Every structure is written in C-alpha cells, then in structure tokens.
Amino acid sequence: MEQLVNELIEANVGRVLVDEPLARYTTMKIGGPADILIVPKHVAGIEKTLQLVKKYKTKWTVIGRGSNLLVSDLGIEGVVIRLGEGLEHLEVEKHRVRVGGGYPLIKLSTLLSRQGLAGLEFASGIPGSVGGAVYMNAGAHKSDISNILSKALILFEDGTIDWLTHGEMEFSYRTSVLQTKRPGIVLEAEFQLQIGERERIVSVMQKNKDYRRETQPWNHPCAGSVFRNPTPYFAGDLIEKAGLRGYQIGGAQISEMHGNFIINTGGASAQDVLSLIALIKQTIKDKFGVAMHTEVEIIGR
C-alpha cells in the first residue's frame, strides 16, 4: 500500500490522503477511514489512478459529494476517488448543456434557471454531484435525470473512455447501467433542456425548495431518501403508518418530519443506521406484506 501511495503522489494525480475519515465527506456525517483517498484535480489524474489501482490489484470506489451514501464504520478498503474540484467544467450552448461530473447539482439547476432554461427544476433541492445524479438517475417532483440526459462520458474499469447514449444508459427508477452491468465513472454529462420563461422556472424551483424545506429534515445530517418507493406505495407513508416515526437507535433516528429519512442526531454510527433499516424492513413486511429496498447506497467493509 505504501508503494502505491508513493506512486500516486509522484504521478501528481491530485490530493492523496491516507487513512482519511470519510464522515467529513458524506452528508450523513458517518463513515470510517478510506485506506487511500484521492481527490483528483483533472481527468488525467483519474486515469492514472485507475492505471495504478490495476497495477497493484487494489479495490477502488468512487464517491461524489457524499449524499445518498452510507459508509461503513470500518471505512472503505483500497482507493476511494472523490469527484469534485477537477471535474466542475460547464459549457452552455443555447439549450444544450455539457457539465463535469463533479459539478454540484443544486448549483447547476440554480444557474440554468436564471438563464431561462427549463428541465432541471426538479433538482433544485437535490444535494450531490452531476456524476452521482446520472449514476443513480436521481429525481424528485415526478421527474428525473433520464428525462433530460442525452449522453454521458464514462471512464470504465478497464481505463477506456466512451460516450454512452441515453438508451445505452438503460435508465430505470433510481438506476442506470453503471450500477448493474457496466461500472464506471461519470466524467461529463450532456443535457438537453428547453428554453422557457425565466420567472416561471425560478418560481417552480422556489416552490420545490420550499416543499423540501417544509417536509424534509435537511437541518440534520442525513443521506436523503433511505428507501425506494415500493409502487404503488410511498415509503415514507408506510413507515409512518407503521408507527415508526421518531424511532431511534443510538444516534440514528427516523425523522419526525418525514418517515423515509434517517437523521444523525449526533454521534450516530453506520451500524445504528443499518439497525434502523433492518427494523423498518421487517416491520413493513410484517404489517403490510411489502418488501422495502434501499435507495441509499451502502458501501464499505
């Protein structure tokens, strides 16, 4: 591992941090250390990192801005690549937008709305990066990334880089081909938006933000929606009907504000959250006969 660290530093891939606690990089404020954390400063840095990871036969994981993520208390083995600083380029040409995978999604939706571009209003309250949003087909307010993405530039495990079209991304509810068949890193996304009325777009975005503020507990560390909605039901409704609102294990609590959110009240461990998730699954299965599946990504040792 020491030799790998030395080569990563010599290759100038970006910031190289050893045994770096990941709690500070997740919106849940939970997570043990990464053996090696890389914050690449350019695409070449990511490519070189993957070359060295392959050379040393080391496991690797990619995170964005740490939303929709629960990291194990034991941390993550191998190399963790955090997208951000080196992938925040943006190019807007009429209604076509090309943007780096590390660009903050809320910042992008706000900026484009002010330019009178419609289509990203749903993302006005979704924390995280463009890359993470494309990876999991993030959505809200009856829309999602699949409605606006035309193609995405992906760096695959074998080091090749290629564009995947909308069809090749194989989008479904909170899922893409990158989670199922072709693991890779979203370097860039191209969105097709519509030219609209600026005042109306900004108004819709503000309503979405207000709704989130009034119904979701973003004043506490959390990872967003914990469970996928089991059609035709809503996960939050089932959890609340089961009487679990406010239930707490350790420092993790099912939000009083929204049943599908687990908040860190202070000092929560990943195990606290996992115990709550298991309790919810079993309770909903017993009471309603409905199987619950997590939307939050659980990673680590």
From Swiss-Prot:
Residues 29-196 form the FAD-binding PCMH-type domain. One of its GO terms (cellular component) is cytosol. It comes from the Bacteria. It catalyses: UDP-N-acetyl-alpha-D-muramate + NADP(+) = UDP-N-acetyl-3-O-(1-carboxyvinyl)-alpha-D-glucosamine + NADPH + H(+). This is UDP-N-acetylenolpyruvoylglucosamine reductase 1. It comes from Bacillus cereus (strain ZK / E33L). Cell wall formation. PROSITE patterns: FAD_PCMH. Its cofactor is FAD. Its main location: cytoplasm. It is found in: Cytoplasm. GO terms for molecular function: FAD binding; UDP-N-acetylmuramate dehydrogenase activity. The active site is at 174, 225 (proton donor), 295. Belongs to the MurB family. Its EC number is 1.3.1.98. Coiled coil: none annotated. Pathway: Cell wall biogenesis; peptidoglycan biosynthesis. Keywords: Cell cycle, Cell division, Cell shape, Cell wall biogenesis/degradation, Cytoplasm, FAD, Flavoprotein, NADP, Oxidoreductase, Peptidoglycan synthesis. SUPFAM superfamilies: FAD-binding/transporter-associated domain-like, Uridine diphospho-N-Acetylenolpyruvylglucosamine reductase, MurB, C-terminal domain. One of its GO terms (biological process) is regulation of cell shape. Pfam families: FAD_binding_4, MurB_C. The keyword Nucleus does not apply. PANTHER family: UDP-N-ACETYLENOLPYRUVOYLGLUCOSAMINE REDUCTASE (PTHR21071:SF5).
